[in-house]
Amino acid sequence: MKEQNLTPMEKLATFIVDKRNLFFLLYIFALVFCFFSTGWVNVENDITTYLPEETETRKGLTIMNEEFVTYGSARVMVSNISFAHGEMLKEKIESIEGVSEAAFDSSAGHYINSSALYDITFDGTASDEISVHAMHEVKEALAGYDVYINTEVGVDSAADLKQEMQVIIVIAAVIIVAVLTLTSRSYAEVPVLIATFGVAALLNMGTNFLCGTISFISNSVTVVLQLALAIDYAIILCHRFSDEHEPLEAREACIAALSKAIPEISSSSLTTISGLAALAFMHFKIGLDLSTVLIKAILLSLLSVFTLMPGLLMLFSKLIDKTGHRKLLPQITLIGRFDVLTRYIIPPVFVVILGVTAVWANKCPYCYSFTDLTTAKQSESQIAYQKIKNTFGAGNMVAVIIPSGNYRAEASLLQSLESAPEVKSAMGLANIRAMDDYTLTSALNPRQFSELAGIEYEVASLLYSAYAVNDDQYGQILKGLDQYQVPLFDMFLFLKEQMERGNITLEEDIQETLDDLFDQLEKARLQLKTDSYSRLVVYLNLPEESQETFDFLKFIHREAGRYYDDNNVYVVGNSTSDYDLSSSFGQDNLLISILSALFVIVILLFTFKSAGLPVLLILVIQGSIWINFSFPYLQSSPLYFLSYLIVNSIQMGANIDYAIVISSHYKDLKKEMRPKQAIVEALNEAFPTIFTSGSILAGAGALIGQMTTNPIISAIGVCLSRGTLISIGLVLGVLPQILVLGDQIIERTSFELNHINLTPKSFSGVTRVQGRIRGNVNGIVEGSFDGFIRGDMEALIISGKASAVTEESFKAEYQGKSYAGADTPTLSDSGGKENQAPENIVKGESANEQTNKTNI
């Protein structure tokens, strides 16, 4: 291969192959860096973080996190004990340091059918060490009992998921090695492929820190999906190298293979990238997170295939030659023949199935809460949750955040909510009982407060005077303090402040009583009141997710709107999160479906240069999507909405590659044989690629679905595996018939893009030229001509064509034509005689002919 005759792509391939040791060194540095940088990645485990900023849940959670303290809690059920034994355990639990309260009584909400339920509250948040240690002590105290614990305290779901994914990756690696061995042409190709994608995976994990914070979904499934989605790229280059290596040496074969594979692989990756890019347009920002991380994974896989794998192929070339083996995958000629025989039967049946499944998929029951999703593998926490739910029911709590300061309005709102049959209980400062039937927000005058607190009236009067001065209410002092009323909660906090400053000293027994009271009031303040907001805690008799629940959330807003500006009222909880997600799902679903299909159609339009073929391919893959999401409807099993959005985009962006590879082979083979024969041969040629990619993606999805306890990740895996298998079935059992029947449509809607190839082409010897060219020949030619050029030619082929011919072909064609100034078809070097053949004979447009140097 002459250096001056190389195309730009061949020059790039030559540089990569010849500088492979430099690339090895760069990858070593990058891998060392990424090994350490993987620990820099921040992983977000709370999916509500990705809710749009304008949603009520996101606004409310921001206020709650900034203004209030939420103490850790646990629901603990102990079965097969008597009520008396249950009371004994309550005292035992409450004696543990770090446990604030263990609610238990004889009501059906706490004791039923020999099972006791304790609602435990800790002295710290769910992540505080005091709560974690107390939870550990509770487990030890209940060891030996039939106990079920549902809590977030001391539970590291991220670590559990990471451990599960490590096991999944190991098993997936074994499956991938087995599949690659079946589809390889040499056993030594397998370590090359594994090394290439091992490097790509580590590079992706090591660069995730550039995204700032990524979701636990992206962090857990990206590695497996990266391998499954991008393994084709390495296989294409590997097979190209194998083909080129038959007549060429390893270096030349690698250069030729890489120069041909780069455009082929790049175009193949566009459909996958476009499908993933559609996720970025979701209102739910988890889509942008997944899109960013997965597209980065695909791009790094491409980089590894283009720059690392050629060097590995050169390194392993001798071993690849020695370990070659026969094809292990069988031909699927029988399937191809069956497709041809059923070409008039399957398509009509498919159209009917398409219509039915489109309706079923539209009726797919979606869910927006993952608490009730069941997984094939259950964690102890999930088992406990289901056990407690089946015995005592599931708790559904929402927090109502309102402006603080108006205790009367708060009390009225609480009373209104408690009177609703949908409410189990409602709690706020305005309805928490203190002493003598007073609530914490009851307004007391000095005499009432002195009697309640057990202090002298004079001390209480001084305290009220100081409070009035501190609150700039001097008029109350002038009017007299007997009628001056201050909410009990505010006055106790003011009393505490004055005692801490040393302005008031009480008797020791009263001091101890008030200290205990102050501790309880401080906890209540941290949980329920700040300077700007108050928080009401409402327990509902409704499921976490239902239309009735969503309607009642609107009722809460209407009631709160009677006392407060509704723009300053926020209802926060799992139910509101589900409502916000359901509100945006319809729009996100439509957006992703349209964008992913549109992106893919545009790419296919320019790939196949046909308007009909992309529509047929999209129809088949869309059919696989509808069939996939008909299963939840038929099984009456709710589907987590995020599973639909993610799998929909992956199926449209990645599974369509299976249809593309069959169509590409069919279109090429159709030039050499009849459509029926072409489709059979196309299936045989495409099957190894489809088998490799499809089996890995389906296997990876099945592993994720069956081996993780995280309901979101599991749901994605199950849908992805099922969707991939359906896609494979349709492209092998339906698409061939459609291609054969629709052959006329494909041909009639085909088009060619007129373009100028600006890449100079070089020829030496006798060259046939048909068209308009511009460049250096031997002489100056500008105009229309149809003939031959003798000598060296380097020119742009503006229109028409040019090709080298043999002496014999030249003489044979020359004898049948008459060229000006030529009598004898004799070819010789420049400087010929009068009766020699002309030195420059071309077909096309030419002008300005000279005898020495020709610029065309």
Please describe what each predicted stretch is.
Residues 1-43, 126-369, 373, 544-547, ...:
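Membrane-embedded transmembrane helical bundles of large multi-pass transporters/channels
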Residues 77-84, 119-128, 151-154, 374-378, ...:
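Structural beta->alpha junctions
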Residues 39-75, 363-401, 515-523, 765-771, ...:
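Solvent-exposed, non-transmembrane loop/terminal regulatory segments of multi-pass membrane proteins
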Residues 2-28, 35-41, 54, 59, ...:
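Structural signature of multi-pass, alpha-helical inner-membrane proteins
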Residues 54, 58-59, 67, 79-121, ...:
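Extracytoplasmic
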Residues 51, 67-73, 81, 344-469:
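Juxtamembrane segments of multi-pass membrane proteins
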Residues 72-77, 114-124, 360-361, 366-370, ...:
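Short, hydrophobic beta-strand segments
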Residues 418-419, 499, 503-512, 534-541, ...:
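Basic-flanked hydrophobic alpha-helices used for secretion and membrane insertion
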